[in-house]
Design a protein with these regions (language model features):
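N-terminal low-complexity, Ser/Thr- and acidic-residue-enriched intrinsically disordered segments
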Residues: 18-113
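Short, functionally important structural connectors and interaction interfaces within domains
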Residues: 72, 95, 106-109, 118, ...
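A general "terminal functional-core" signal
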Residues: 2-41, 48-50, 55-57, 133-378
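Charged, often glycine-rich, active-site loop that binds/positions anionic groups
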Residues: 107-131
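Short, flexible active-site-adjacent loop segments at beta-strand->alpha-helix junctions, enriched
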Residues: 65-67, 120, 183-184, 246
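Alpha-helical structural motif
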Residues: 84, 110, 118-122, 160, ...
Length: 378
C-alpha cells in the first residue's frame, strides 16, 4: 500500500490545527472582553450615582444616617464602632464646622452599579447570610434571615459605596470631597472580607475614568491594614499608582496583592508617631517626583491610633491630624482633586479624632467649609 502521509506532514497539520484553535480562543476571549467593557461603560453612563449638587446649597461632605449599622445589638460583637459615621457628623455639627443641611446625601448603589466591578456570582453570594457573616466577621449574622442582613447591614454599605463614587465627582468640581464613610479596601471584584462587602474604591475610580475623563489616579492607603482589595482589582491597570503604609504583622497578609503596590511601606506593630510621619513624608516626596495624579483617593483609616485592638500601631491623635494634613497638602501641591474616605478605626475615640482632623483641615484652609468653619490660614 502506498504511503500517503509522512509523519512530518501529519505533525505540520496538527500544529496548524493547534495554532488555529489557539487563535480562535484568543479571538473569543478578546470579543468577550470587549463586550464586558461595553456593558461596563453602559452601566456607568446609565447610573444615577452622579447627582448634581449646587455649591450654593451643599458642601462637598457626603454622609447619610443610613450609613450606620445597628440591629439587635449584634453589631457590638465586632470591635468596629458601627455608628462611627454618625458620631463624626454630630461632632462636626456640634463644633460648628459643618451644618447638617449642607451635607450631601448620596444615592444607594444598585446592583447594576455594583456590576461595573463585581461579578454576578459574587453579588449572588451575598444572598447567603453565612457568606456575609464571613465577610463581616460577625458569626451570628449567619443565622439571620437574609432580608434582614440586606436591610440592616448591606444597605448601609451600599449607601456608603454611593457616597464614595459621588465624592469623586464632587472633588473634580470643588477640588476636594470627604465621604464620612467608605474605604472598603479589602473587597475586590470577586471576594469580600475584613468588614468590606463592596469595592467602593475600585468602583469610584472606574466611574471617574468614564464620567470624569480622569486617567491618572493615586491611591494613598493609610489604614493600618493592607488594601489588598483595590490592589487585586488594579493588578493590570497602570493608570493607578498605589502607596500603601500598613502593619505587615496583621490581616490580611496578602502577599500576591502586595506585588501591585508601587510604594509599599511595611510597618511593624508598635510603630510610633514620629517614625510613622517621617516615613509618610518620605513616601509623599518620592511619589511627587514619579506620578502626576488627576485624582487622589485617600483611604484615611484611624485604626493606626494607639490602643486600636486590630491596628496595633502607636500613632497619637495629633499624629493622625498631621498625617491627614500632609496628604491634603500633597494633593494641593500636585493641583489634584482629593477624596477622603474614613475607612477602618475600631475605637470609640476614632470619631472624635476624625472630626478634629477635618476641623484642622478647614482651619488650615486645605478645605473650604463656609457653612461653619473658621480658623487662621497657615
Amino acid at each position: 500500500m502506498a504511503k500517503i502521509w509522512s509523519w512530518v506532514q501529519v505533525d505540520s497539520i496538527r500544529s496548524l490545527c493547534v495554532v488555529s484553535f489557539h487563535q480562535r480562543a484568543v479571538m473569543a476571549a478578546s470579543s468577550t472582553l470587549q463586550e464586558d467593557q461595553v456593558k461596563q461603560k453602559q452601566r456607568i453612563e446609565a447610573s444615577k450615582l452622579y447627582i448634581n449638587v449646587s455649591p450654593d446649597e451643599k458642601d462637598p461632605v457626603v454622609y447619610s444616617s443610613s450609613y450606620n449599622v445597628s440591629f439587635l445589638g449584634i453589631e457590638k460583637l465586632h470591635p468596629f464602632d458601627a455608628s462611627k459615621w454618625s458620631h463624626v457628623q454630630n461632632f462636626l455639627s456640634d463644633d460648628g464646622v459643618l451644618k447638617q443641611k449642607r451635607i450631601v446625601e448620596p444615592v444607594e448603589a444598585t446592583r447594576d452599579d455594583l456590576l461595573v466591578v463585581h461579578t454576578e456570582k459574587y453579588l449572588d453570594s451575598l444572598n447567603s447570610s453565612y457568606v456575609v457573616a464571613q465577610i463581616t466577621e460577625v458569626a451570628p449574622v449567619a443565622f439571620l434571615p437574609n432580608f434582614l442582613v440586606q436591610w440592616k447591614l448591606l444597605h448601609p454599605f451600599r449607601k456608603q459605596v454611593g457616597g464614595t463614587v459621588l465624592s469623586a465627582k464632587l472633588a473634580k468640581e470643588r477640588g476636594w470631597a470627604i465621604n464620612i464613610g467608605g474605604g472598603f479596601h479589602h473587597c475586590c471584584a470577586n471576594e469580600g472580607g475584613g468588614f468590606c462587602a463592596y469595592a467602593d474604591i475600585t468602583l469610584a475610580i472606574q466611574f471617574a475614568y468614564t464620567r470624569l475623563a480622569i486617567s491618572r489616579v493615586i491611591i494613598i492607603d493609610l489604614d493600618a491594614h493592607q488594601g489588598n482589595g483595590h490592589e487585586r482589582d488594579f493588578t493590570n491597570d497602570d493608570r493607578v499608582y498605589i502607596i500603601d503604609m500598613y502593619n505587615e504583622d496583621i490581616y490580611p497578609q496578602d502577599f500576591k496583592a502586595r506585588k501591585r503596590i508601587n510604594q509599599a511601606v511595611a510597618l511593624k506593630s508598635g510603630t510610633k508617631t514620629d517614625r510613622y510621619l517621617a516615613l509618610l513624608s518620605q513616601e509623599l516626596k518620592k511619589a511627587a517626583t514619579i506620578f502626576k495624579p488627576e485624582l487622589v483617593v485617600y483611604n484615611a483609616g484611624t485604626d493606626v491610633l494607639e490602643g486600636d485592638p486590630l491596628g496595633r500601631l502607636l500613632v497619637s491623635p495629633e499624629g493622625v491630624k498631621q498625617r491627614d494634613e500632609m496628604v491634603f497638602r500633597f494633593a494641593k501641591d500636585q493641583k489634584s482633586p482629593i477624596i477622603m474616605l474614613t475607612s477602618g478605626g475600631y475605637m470609640k475615640t476614632s470619631a472624635r479624632v476624625i472630626a478634629d482632623s477635618i476641623k484642622n483641615l478647614a482651619a488650615k484652609r486645605l478645605i473650604s467649609l463656609p457653612s461653619g468653619s473658621s480658623g487662621s490660614s497657615s
